[in-house]
UniProtKB/Swiss-Prot annotation:
This is HTH-type transcriptional activator RhaR. It comes from the Bacteria. Residues 196-217, 244-267 bind DNA. Keywords: Activator, Cytoplasm, DNA-binding, Repeat, Rhamnose metabolism, Transcription, Transcription regulation.
Length: 282
């Protein structure tokens, strides 16, 4: 088995007293599977890519939020103008008396739900705090580490306030149409999605929404939905015993032959080949 790449805190933190830092990825390039000896929060600002976390693929774009534990293994592939920030931290160095474990999924172990989403309002507020955090964590002045940790605590609580699961934007949310569209797409894994109906409900221009979506994500709406469905199919092929025809239905493809064509085009192998190759990892 090939040696697992591991990123070390000595290469990312200025001293052994520093608990928090910000690692920009402008843009994020393809990055091989790796682990760390620190933890991180990942926030995607724009573009798209394939993020594989603990063998589960996610098609990521603006608003995706991940909580990564040190022992988690992940990689980035098929990136397209993918811009994100990693807020990296060492749990054992945090000194503030906050309920870190309650606020950060998987804080003390590789458990809990790692994938969430942020709407435009949450992203704007997070970006502001991260900017301050990045400034403080790069300072060599008294109390810089303490200030950075205070800002990290503020960020963690802010994310708790604004995050939501990928397919369930709160009904009282005042988020933008783009946020609501991405949530609706995530909830359409098994069922058909009609953009014209969505636009009628939202009283918006289909043409303008298509343009906004492509500008922010680097994909068309159909491309995004197709790739989200393929990612879900990859996961089911590896981690379930469902028949390929049943997986096709679970992922919103009414015809299993068409599913095989799309899956092969997106991944370079047939569903059965994918299942055989990846079942050897379990």
């Amino acid at each position: 088995m090939a040696h697992q790449l591991k990123l070390l805190k000595d290469d990312f933190f200025a001293s052994d007293q520093q608990a928090v830092a910000v690692a920009d990825r402008y843009p994020q390039d393809v990055f091989a599977e790796h682990t760390h000896d620190f933890c991180e929060l990942v926030i995607v600002w724009r573009g798209n890519g394939l993020h594989v976390l603990n063998d589960r693929p996610y098609r990521i774009t603006r608003g995706d939020l991940f909580y990564i534990h040190a022992d988690d293994k992940h990689s980035y592939a098929s990136v397209n103008d993918l811009v994100l920030q990693n807020i990296i931290y060492c749990p054992e160095r945090l000194k503030l008396n906050l309920d870190w474990q309650g606020a950060i999924p998987g804080f003390s172990a590789s458990a809990g739900q790692p994938h969430w989403r942020l709407g435009s309002m949450g992203m704007a507020q997070a970006r502001q705090v991260i900017g301050q955090l990045e400034h403080e964590s790069s300072q060599h002045v008294p109390f810089a580490n303490e200030m950075a940790e205070l800002l990290f605590g503020q960020l963690v609580m802010l994310l708790n306030r604004h995050r939501y699961t990928s397919d369930s934007l709160p009904p009282t949310s005042s988020e933008t149409l783009l946020d609501k569209l991405i949530t609706r797409l995530a909830a359409s894994l098994k069922s058909p999605f009609a953009l014209d109906k969505f636009c009628d409900e939202a009283s918006c221009s289909e043409r303008v929404l298509r343009q906004q979506f492509r500008q922010q994500t680097g994909m068309t709406i159909n491309q995004y939905l197709r790739q989200v469905r393929v990612c879900h199919a990859q996961y089911l092929l590896q981690h379930s015993r469902l028949l390929i025809s049943d997986i096709s239905t679970e992922c919103g493809f009414e015809d299993s032959n068409y599913f095989s064509v799309v899956f092969t085009r997106e991944t370079g192998m047939t569903p059965s080949q994918w299942r055989h190759l990846n079942s050897q990892k379990d």
